[in-house]
Amino acid sequence: MHIYKVGGAVRDRLLGRPVSDIDWLVVGATVEEMLAKGYRPVGADFPVFLHPKTGEEYALARTERKSGRGYGGFTFHASPDVTLEEDLIRRDLTINAMAEDEAGTVYDPYHGKDDLDQRLLRHVSPAFAEDPLRVLRVARFAARYAPLGFRVADETLELMRQISASGELQALTAERSWKEIERALMEARPQVFFQVLGACGALHELLPELVDDTQALAALEQAAAHEQPLHVRWACLLRGLAPAPIKTVNQRLKAPRECQELALLTGECLAQGNQAQELPATALLELLQKFDVYRRPQRFEDFIVVCEMAALGDGKSSYPQADYLRGAAAAARAVDVKPLVQAGLTGQALGEALKRERLKAVEAYKRS
């Protein structure tokens, strides 16, 4: 029974990057032996166990073969006679197919260290093409390691083109696709993810609305550079789409509600935001009301940030509309409802009076 660190922990240590999660591989053990040592089984599809003290995952060495369509169409075989090399060859990239034993010796049968040195994302074997999810994973790794100069190897990009052309990407569930997109959006260079998908034809299959949309990627690049949260990055990515296709994309990928909401509001209101100073007071107040700046001020602030990231992505050095919009929102929020209530107004009459007072406040702000 031999235990190895595998995958990302080995890769990131060799790159000098922080190691967060550690995956462990057990070679030469049976399920019964693992149970006898106190490991707790958690794997539904293949033998994975939790360490009795650390809670970290330990997987038995296994092989796999294609048995159906999509990322889930595999049959696994785990037994004590599966070797380290047989387990590592089923992995996606050479830089993820290294192992390290308890003495610190690195096992690298597929030359992952060479590809780390050459800054290449290269597939381990032709079996790479059997799992369509790997197209998204490789694009995500390209986004993560772009600051270090990594690129996708030509032969791997060609395999990704073949997968995209095969229709296998259509077998991915919305949940799996979104999980990869979500993680990619939060990488250092998220625009690279979509550039790689575009280069291999996968973007046309998964997000045809974004094909050749360089402005969207420029806005996303700015959002990442300014360390914006997920929903802001998503809205930046969809900034150039009309409301109808934004709804289509949101529904197709089952994006989280916060992402859907901000992206759709941006699609509906980006033009007004960009023309904020020219809007009449009534239109400016309608914009504030649409975002419910009184109860949900952060949502309007997020919208302003999306507008700003889009402007910076378009090459503008600043976005003066941002402070103008914030000032208008502050003026409308400053209106005190108490005098209206004390005057005996209720219901619809109160709402209409409050709106009139807010309009006066916005008009005064515009004159200031």
Swiss-Prot record:
CDD domains named in the record: NT_ClassII-CCAase
Keyword Nucleotidyltransferase: yes
Gene Ontology molecular functions: ATP binding; CCA tRNA nucleotidyltransferase activity; magnesium ion binding; tRNA binding
Cofactor needs: Mg(2+)
Enzyme class: transferase
Catalytic activity: a tRNA precursor + 2 CTP + ATP = a tRNA with a 3' CCA end + 3 diphosphate; a tRNA with a 3' CCA end + 2 CTP + ATP = a tRNA with a 3' CCACCA end + 3 diphosphate
Enzyme Commission number: 2.7.7.72
GO BP, sorted A to Z: RNA repair; tRNA 3'-terminal CCA addition
UniProt-annotated binding residues for Mg(2+): D21, D23
Entry keywords, A to Z: ATP-binding, Magnesium, Metal-binding, Nucleotide-binding, Nucleotidyltransferase, RNA repair, RNA-binding, Transferase, tRNA processing
Function: Catalyzes the addition and repair of the essential 3'-terminal CCA sequence in tRNAs without using a nucleic acid template. Adds these three nucleotides in the order of C, C, and A to the tRNA nucleotide-73, using CTP and ATP as substrates and producing inorganic pyrophosphate. tRNA 3'-terminal CCA addition is required both for tRNA processing and repair. Also involved in tRNA surveillance by mediating tandem CCA addition to generate a CCACCA at the 3' terminus of unstable tRNAs. While stable tRNAs receive only 3'-terminal CCA, unstable tRNAs are marked with CCACCA and rapidly degraded.
Protein name: CCA-adding enzyme
Species in which this protein is naturally found: Pseudomonas putida (strain GB-1)
Gene name in the database record: cca
